[in-house]
């Protein structure tokens, strides 16, 4: 079984990725298990940040690395929090504070004008200088509710509502979320290529 490093120490992401890639012959380990710290996200796009993280993980561990950069894009806020989703309320990152700030920013925005989407880019590098990274992206359309609802998931899940399913991401079971999320959609693009890419 091939080793693949997740360029993140986020336990929620690691669990999601392991569940979504079940059946693929990969041992997925968080970079934190190798003592690798997060690298500053200095890119100006989701793709740049994912590449920065994947290269850093490859360089520090010597293994192929998978990195994602994702965020919540809210139309009424001109795309914010976007690239700064994890640090929207400042650092250190705090999901509850991020959610509270976002809800405050949308306080006067009525139903019907609270459209949003989760967007994810996933990058897979065989080595730090891989000239041909595998890149996929995924989008999950929804809207922002007026108050948090549900206890599952992480990040903005309690305030991101999927009208098709009539619930927030935090109210969904992991099985459903792992089929329809932005990250799941990006990983679905990668799944078929993983066997060849890792050979």
Curated annotation (Swiss-Prot):
Top class in the EC scheme: hydrolase
Keyword DNA-binding (UniProt): no
UniProt cross-references to Gene3D superfamilies, sorted A to Z: 3.90.950.10
UniProt keyword annotation of Metal-binding present: yes
Known catalytic reactions: XTP + H2O = XMP + diphosphate + H(+); dITP + H2O = dIMP + diphosphate + H(+); ITP + H2O = IMP + diphosphate + H(+)
Cofactor: Mg(2+)
A GO molecular-function descriptor: ITP diphosphatase activity
InterPro entries assigned: dITP/XTP_pyrophosphatase, ITPase-like_fam, RdgB/HAM1
Record's subunit section: Homodimer.
Superkingdom as given in the UniProt entry: Bacteria
Record: residues binding substrate: 8-13, 70, 154-157, 177, 182-183
Coiled coil: none
EC number(s) reported in the record: 3.6.1.66
Pfam families for the chain: Ham1p_like
Residue sites binding Mg(2+) per the record: 69
Cofactor binding, note field: Binds 1 Mg(2+) ion per subunit.
Function: Pyrophosphatase that catalyzes the hydrolysis of nucleoside triphosphates to their monophosphate derivatives, with a high preference for the non-canonical purine nucleotides XTP (xanthosine triphosphate), dITP (deoxyinosine triphosphate) and ITP. Seems to function as a house-cleaning enzyme that removes non-canonical purine nucleotides from the nucleotide pool, thus preventing their incorporation into DNA/RNA and avoiding chromosomal lesions.
Record-level GO cellular component terms: cytosol
Positions of the catalytic residues: 69
PANTHER family xref list: INOSINE TRIPHOSPHATE PYROPHOSPHATASE (PTHR11067:SF9), INOSINE TRIPHOSPHATE PYROPHOSPHATASE/HAM1 PROTEIN (PTHR11067)
Assigned keywords, A-Z: Hydrolase, Magnesium, Metal-binding, Nucleotide metabolism, Nucleotide-binding
Family designation: Belongs to the HAM1 NTPase family.
GO biological process per UniProt: nucleotide metabolic process; purine nucleoside triphosphate catabolic process
Listed NCBIfam families: RdgB/HAM1 family non-canonical purine NTP pyrophosphatase
Protein name as annotated: dITP/XTP pyrophosphatase
């Amino acid at each position: 079984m091939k080793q693949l490093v997740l360029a993140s120490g986020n336990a929620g992401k690691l669990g999601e990725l392991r569940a979504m890639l079940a059946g693929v012959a990969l041992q997925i380990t968080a970079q934190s298990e190798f003592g690798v710290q997060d690298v500053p996200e200095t890119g100006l796009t989701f793709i740049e940040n994912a590449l920065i993280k994947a290269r850093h993980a490859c360089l520090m561990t010597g293994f192929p690395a998978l990195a994602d950069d994702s965020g919540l894009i809210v139309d009424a806020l001109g795309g914010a929090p976007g690239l700064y989703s994890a640090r929207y309320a400042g650092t250190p990152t705090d999901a509850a504070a991020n959610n509270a700030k976002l809800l405050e920013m949308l306080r006067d925005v009525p139903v019907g004008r609270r459209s949003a989407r989760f967007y994810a880019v996933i990058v897979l590098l065989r080595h730090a200088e891989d000239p041909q990274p595998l890149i996929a992206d995924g989008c999950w359309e929804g809207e922002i509710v007026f108050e948090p609802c549900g206890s599952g998931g992480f990040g903005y899940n309690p305030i991101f509502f999927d009208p098709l399913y009539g619930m927030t991401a935090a109210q969904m079971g992991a099985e459903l979320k792992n089929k329809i999320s932005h990250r799941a959609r990006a990983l679905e693009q990668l799944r078929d290529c993983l066997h060849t890419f890792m050979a």
